[in-house]
Amino acid sequence: MADEQLNEKDLNVEETGAGNAADTRVLELEEQLAAAKDQALRAVADLQNVRRRAEQDVEKAHKFALEKFSSDLLPVIDSLELALAHSSAEDEHVKQIREGVELTLKMFQDTLKRYNLEAVDPHGQPFNPEHHQAMAMQENAEVEPNSVLNVFQKGYLLNGRLLRPAMVVVSKAPSAAQPSINEKA
């Protein structure tokens, strides 16, 4: 009987040892499985990020592909506008030429508008350093300080991105008159 009890104890110890080894192995495998799942999720997330970035790059390429071309056309628009500004509508000798230039400019502007190229003509608006470049400041009591008084050259936006800033004259508040020597005393 004592031998049977010893055998049972040995079997229990062996089973416990084998059970501990199996439990340890199961825990290791569960940890490996969790790590593999985490790695797979990270790989999927990385793939989605790469795909999203590629789509954004393609979208930007389509959206701003005309940027250089549009920049090169802006001096042509400026020249047509300058021709209209310096020609007289009453002069019979240039009336037909002026009408042709007006139509050409209108067609040109309509075409550029179709491709989301917008003019920035800020006359009378508050100065915006993101879209305007101040060429000079001028005292003026009739308008709010930091308002655009004059536009030397229109600016342009392509799909909301600044292509060229508007060159402007900005108002400033009139300076107070310097007191004379007699007023100081």
Curated annotation (Swiss-Prot):
GO terms for biological process: protein folding. Its main location: cytoplasm. InterPro entries: GrpE, GrpE_coiled_coil, GrpE_head. GO terms for cellular component: cytosol. Residues 1-22 are annotated as: Disordered. The keyword Chaperone applies. Residues 1-12 have a biased composition (Basic and acidic residues). The keyword Cytoplasm applies. It is found in: Cytoplasm. Keywords: Chaperone, Cytoplasm, Stress response. Pfam families: GrpE. Homodimer. This is Protein GrpE. It comes from Pseudomonas putida (strain ATCC 700007 / DSM 6899 / JCM 31910 / BCRC 17059 / LMG 24140 / F1).
